[in-house]
Amino acid sequence: TTRYPRRLLVKNDGSCEWVGVLHEVITAKNAATSNETYVEGDYHVISGRFGARNQNPNKYLDDAHMLEEAYAQEQNQALKRRYAYYCGQSYRDCNEPALAAEWYERNIELCSKTGEEVRFSLIALGTEYRKLNDSAKTLEAWWNAYNAAPQHAEALGLIAEYLYVLERYSLGLEVAKKAATLPDPLPHATLFVNEPVHRYVIWYEL
């Protein structure tokens, strides 16, 4: 299960708008005067897959092509970065790991060197390189993900599990021990939380 915060409740006064050609996000028209609060509680959003777009057997490939075009035309750097990331996601979902990695790398080039966006993009990049059986690039991406946000254990958990697969047991154990010392991520301050890594993977490697 992947858990993430999302803006969904807004004041109906015209101060916010949806932005993006796909994977739209709610943004404030005037960021300087906007206020945002994370709502605590046992609330969940049901994500449906019932619209016409989801009946298209080539949905993810078509999405990737649309996002490529939007990326080429977009001047806003934040949206351009977002399009590159979701283009990578779309190629991932239609089982094109090489193209997915290419677009994640474009996204990473537009990100700051630290923080949530680059951390999660590097994790995604490493996952695609693992599919391509490139262990060096997989580990490089995940180490970079950890260095981008060293308070997060997720990248270390993935590294520890992969080192076990590579039969590098001693190093994997040390990485898992380090991961186990880090606190659970705060939902409102984390872009995406890969809960199985925190709940099971790290502890299994110990």
Where are these regions (language model features)?
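Short coil turns that delineate tetratricopeptide repeat
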Residues: 75-78, 112, 116, 150, ...
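Start-of-helix register in tetratricopeptide repeats
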Residues: 82, 116-120, 153-154, 171, ...
